[in-house]
Amino acid sequence: MNYWLMKSEPSAFSIDDLQQMPEQTEHWDGVRNYQARNMMRDQMKVGDEVFFYHSNCETPGIVGLMEVVRESYPDHTAFDPQSKYFDPKSSPDQPRWYMVDIKYLRHTRRILPLAELKQHEALEHMPLVRKGNRLSIMPVSPAEWNYILRLEDE
């Protein structure tokens, strides 16, 4: 099993939105960065666990846990001219972009703010806390995952 962190602006799609979806499951669409796409397409597997991270908001941070319940498949929003994620170079025959389905597991017991995560030496190598890393999807090591879960109770 792998661990991940996936970012979303809560004004676009929040942990509460995911919790309210039918079966608390939704596809994670709109990823338009090749490195993030490659991780989602090539490495994410059913059963992988994911931190849900709220970005571009008053208190950016980890707000919940999700699970990958369907491995990558073509992102249909890339084919829709009415979608903000439309890509004229992507087609059903030759898709350029992919998505996975994720399922809500739970909210974290408290928001784990980015500012707090940056203060922990044990997380200094985590892509999230390093300068210049703006990927919307990133791997989390098992040690980082377990450390962050322990922070919920502090």
Question: Where does each model-flagged region fall?
Answer:
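Compositionally biased, charged N-terminal/linker segments
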Residues: 1-46, 144-145, 152-154
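Short, charged beta-turn/beta-strand-edge "cap" motif at the junction between a beta-strand
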Residues: 53-60
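Aromatic- and Lys/Arg-enriched surface recognition patch
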Residues: 64-131, 135
